[in-house]
């Protein structure tokens, strides 16, 4: 038996000690988390909403009315993604893919429905009188077939004879005028119905019963309403057009009970909408967190409500408030995707309590596939002064470059990490390569080390020795000899490199500073005797000693000639 737990972006599988109660299964199940992140269309939703979120954070808290603008931008992004998903789903022949897109469309429809209702009830906070008008717009937005039927009827040659005519009756009176005259008109129509004035015309009588809000008549038209909340708004329009926000929950529960038969099971969406009608925003957020397949909705809705000053302080047990907790969960999910992780950084930035700590943990898990990506991650860390992460990234890239024998890149990363030990190691590799090949690689980097060469003694020697070669190549022998002597006296040259250094310096032995070279040669001779080097190296020492003696003699002769 195997158990598993979700980790940051991956799954942890572990062995359990449960005894199997029967034979094991023959199937291997593939488990995925946050599968929506891999949808190219839904990634547009995440990217677009990221820009809206960042813009919302820059709005001055002293101007809460401005916070109310982004909610429509969020909804327009939801609508655009949903329409694109519907178009793609209609063209796909793969049944499995089609089902997947269909499920995503259904989820986005539910998200838009809940989001729009939260706008009406919480953000716009429509008062009694105009509340019903907002609810009518809400239902019309999510019951578009009514407008389509009305358009078909009006565009037909004979609208009164169209088969959908009685389904979409149209009036010449605005809703505002209707609201003013409604009570007197309602009493008059009710009186006519009781007198059976319209009994001879079934359709006219049906319309009048609907207009006075007869519940039995409305329920008979269930197939035209399709949902209980459509039935709710219809009932309120004809029975209680000036309903108060505080009474909404009573009518919502009543309509749900009336619309659904006893055998119907209440869907999670119904519970969420009921919670909204009860103005229980915390229950809406809680149920959406459980039902929806990602944290996008609850994270952005909670942030928006927080900016509108509609959320009271609601601290959680581990110190983070609800807004921050949901944003952290959403951002952590984004970090698992190869292109969305950069969006997640901004969400962490706007979580003042735990955002930085979470970002430090997540940024270390970003796979540094390429040097370009590593530079992106590094820039993010440097902008936020995350020194530990900067050093870690640079060390990883330096080690990777060293394994690939890219010494220049490795040295550059180690300098950026300010890692003296690693810079020393790479400098040694440069010197070893020089001994083997007789030339330096990555001359541009070594020539432009600047103050960075002071990071370690070995790096300083590498830079200065390269400078010696440049002086030698430019035939500035005196300056080259002085630099070489300073390297000797500073004792920063590795002893293993003295042989190569003296061999390169032979043409300079005619200078008067040859005594320093002789002392160095004695130390080199002692080292070989102690370590028992091969005869070949000992032969080189003897040749160097011979050359040194010859050049010393020539220098003495020249000096004596000049004195006489």
Regions found by a protein language model. Name each.
Residues 192-397, 401, 491, 498-510, ...:
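Extended alpha-helical solenoid scaffold regions that build the rod-like backbones
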Residues 155, 160, 169, 176, ...:
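Solenoid-repeat scaffolds in large eukaryotic assemblies
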Residues 81, 106-117, 131, 162, ...:
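Extended HEAT/HEAT-like alpha-solenoid repeat tracts in very large eukaryotic scaffold/adaptor proteins
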Residues 155, 160-164, 170, 324-333, ...:
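Internal alpha-helical scaffold/solenoid segments in large eukaryotic proteins
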Residues 122-159, 166-209, 368-389, 434-476, ...:
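A cross-kingdom feature marking charged/low-complexity
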Residues 1-91, 391, 401-564:
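Long alpha-helical scaffold regions
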Residues 142, 351, 362, 384, ...:
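Alpha-helical solenoid scaffolds that mediate protein-protein interactions
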């Amino acid at each position: 038996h195997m158990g598993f737990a979700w980790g940051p972006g991956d799954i942890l599988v572990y062995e359990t000690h449960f005894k199997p109660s029967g034979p094991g299964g023959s199937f291997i199940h593939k488990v995925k988390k946050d599968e929506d992140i891999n949808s190219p269309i839904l990634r547009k939703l995440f990217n677009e909403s990221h820009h809206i979120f960042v813009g919302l954070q820059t709005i001055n808290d002293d101007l809460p009315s401005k916070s109310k603008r982004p909610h429509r931008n969020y909804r327009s992004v939801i609508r655009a993604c949903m329409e694109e998903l519907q178009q793609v789903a209609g063209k796909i022949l793969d049944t499995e893919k089609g089902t997947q897109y269909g499920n995503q469309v259904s989820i986005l429809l539910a998200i838009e429905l809940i989001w729009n209702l939260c706008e009406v009830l919480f953000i716009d906070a429509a008062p009694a009188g105009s509340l019903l008008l907002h609810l009518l717009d809400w239902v019309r937005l999510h019951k578009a077939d009514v407008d389509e039927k009305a358009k078909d009827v009006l565009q037909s040659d004979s609208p009164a004879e169209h088969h959908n005519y009685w389904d979409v009756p149209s009036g010449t009176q605005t809703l505002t005028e209707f609201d003013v005259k409604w009570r007197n008109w309602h009493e008059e129509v009710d009186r006519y119905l009781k007198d059976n004035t319209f009994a001879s015309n079934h359709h006219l009588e049906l319309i009048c019963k609907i207009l006075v809000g007869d519940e039995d008549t409305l329920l008979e038209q269930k197939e035209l309403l399709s949902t209980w909340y459509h039935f709710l708004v219809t009932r309120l329009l004809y029975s209680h057009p000036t309903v108060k926000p505080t009474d909404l929950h009573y009518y919502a529960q009543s309509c749900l009970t009336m619309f659904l038969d006893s055998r119907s099971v209440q869907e999670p969406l119904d519970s969420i909408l009921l919670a909204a009608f009860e103005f229980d925003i915390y229950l809406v957020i809680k149920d959406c967190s459980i039902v929806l397949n990602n944290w996008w909705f609850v994270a952005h809705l909670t942030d928006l409500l927080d900016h509108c000053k509609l959320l009271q302080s609601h601290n959680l047990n581990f110190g983070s408030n609800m807004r921050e907790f949901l944003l952290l969960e959403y951002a952590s999910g984004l970090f698992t995707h190869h292109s969305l992780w950069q969006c997640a950084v901004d969400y962490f930035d706007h979580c003042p309590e735990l955002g930085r700590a979470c970002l430090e943990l997540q940024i270390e898990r970003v796979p540094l596939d390429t040097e370009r990506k590593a530079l992106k991650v590094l820039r993010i860390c440097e902008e936020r002064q995350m020194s530990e992460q900067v050093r870690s990234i640079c060390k990883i890239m330096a080690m990777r470059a060293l394994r690939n024998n890219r010494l220049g890149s490795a040295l550059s990363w180690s300098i950026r990490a300010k890692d003296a030990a690693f810079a020393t190691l790479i400098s040694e590799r440069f010197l070893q390569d020089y001994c083997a090949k007789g030339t330096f690689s990555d001359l541009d980097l070594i020539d432009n080390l600047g103050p960075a060469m002071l990071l370690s003694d070995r790096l300083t020697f590498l830079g200065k020795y390269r400078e010696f070669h440049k002086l030698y190549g430019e035939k500035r022998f005196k300056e080259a000899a002085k630099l070489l002597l300073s390297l000797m006296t500073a004792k920063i040259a590795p002893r293993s490199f003295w042989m190569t250094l003296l061999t390169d310096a032979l043409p300079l032995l005619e200078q008067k500073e040859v005594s320093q070279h002789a002392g160095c040669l004695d130390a080199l001779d002692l080292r070989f005797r102690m370590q028992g080097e091969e005869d070949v190296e000992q032969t080189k020492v003897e040749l160097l000693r011979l050359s040194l003696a010859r050049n010393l003699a020539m220098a003495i002769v020249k000096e004596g000639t000049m004195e006489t």
